[in-house]
Design a protein with these regions (language model features):
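The conserved Walker
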Residues: 9
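Hydrophobic positions on the alpha1 helix immediately C-terminal to the Walker A/P-loop
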Residues: 16
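N-terminal phosphate/diphosphate-binding loop that engages ATP/GTP or pyrophosphate donors
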Residues: 21-97
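Phosphate-binding/switch loop-helix module in NTP-utilizing enzymes
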Residues: 93-129, 201-210, 215, 221
Length: 291
């Protein structure tokens, strides 16, 4: 089953998803993919808040977005608020985000690191990663069944080699890394997800839950960004990933359904509430995830 987690911005979807992942792990279900917690800091006293704050009261402001790779828990600084990225020498906005005119400045190197993670997950599920070549039978069939999206730069998503990303990026962090803004935000919010062996070191347990936080305009409108996450979802349910949760903003919900439902069947649209939590947990249990 494909769950599409959606709702208004900054209502706690990722925090809800982190807690859900922790509950799934506690119940014996392997969780693999990525969650994208924000980097939050308290607003200076007297500074007006935006439409939403971390607690709904506007007391916190969002500086950036991290990606936490599951199941191992590795943390990567993924995006920064555009005004802050422009002032920072340590963060370089990638060409993909710039070409798509995204609201956040996203590093191409960070995209490559997350894609390398999803490539490993794809191979464990016997799915060809997006960059494995068009002659692969699995990829070819997925391409036939998947509606085309509008590409960037005549179909070219600027590539960054995964090996280069791993060696050169200053963005890589772990949960016990240096006290940067991302690490401070992580400590303040708490890390509810238990660390596990790296996906490329240990085979994932069967009947795992795939988590993709999130699919945005880069992926659903341009087929760029997290292309290896798209490749796994485009393949539909597999013995390794019979179920998946993808975070999708409301404005892209129709596009996500159009792309994925031919393989998954009718998607289940959920919000960050108790009813959805119980449904996902029961679905995972029925799939044999609890041991």
């Amino acid at each position: 089953m494909l769950f599409l987690l959606t709702g208004d911005v900054q209502i706690g979807k990722t925090r809800w998803l982190e807690n859900l992942c922790a509950s799934l792990q506690a119940a014996g279900t392997c969780v693999a993919g990525v969650v994208a917690p924000g980097q939050w800091v308290p607003r200076p006293e007297g500074q007006p808040g935006g439409k939403h704050g971390f607690d709904g009261a506007g007391r916190f402001e969002k500086l950036g977005i991290d990606n936490v790779l599951l199941p191992q828990g590795k943390r990567i600084e993924f995006a920064r608020r555009r005004d802050l990225a422009a002032k920072s020498k340590a963060f370089t906005e990638g060409t993909q985000a710039k070409a798509a005119k995204l609201g956040w400045a996203i590093s191409d190197t960070a995209i490559a690191q997350v894609n390398a993670h999803f490539a490993t997950l794809a191979k464990q599920a016997s799915i060809a990663p997006a960059d494995s070549g068009a002659d692969d039978s699995t990829t070819t069939q997925a391409e036939v069944d998947t509606p085309a999206a509008a590409p960037l730069d005549n179909g070219v998503c600027p590539p960054v080699a995964a090996e280069t990303a791993a060696k050169t990026s200053p963005l890589v962090q772990t949960n016990t890394g240096e006290s940067t803004a991302a690490a401070t935000a992580a400590k303040a919010g708490g890390n509810v997800l238990a660390a596990a062996p790296a996906a490329n070191e240990t085979r994932l347990a069967p009947h795992a839950m795939l988590v993709v936080d999130e699919l945005g305009r880069l992926e659903l409108l341009h087929s760029c960004g997290l292309t290896n996450a798209l490749a796994i979802l485009d393949a539909g349910p597999t013995p390794q990933f019979p179920h998946a949760i993808a975070v999708v903003r409301e404005t892209l919900l129709d596009e996500a359904r159009r792309r994925f439902e031919p393989r998954w069947g009718k998607a289940t649209v959920i919000g960050p509430d108790d009813a959805a939590r119980n449904l996902v947990l029961e679905t995972a249990r029925a799939a044999g995830g609890a041991h």
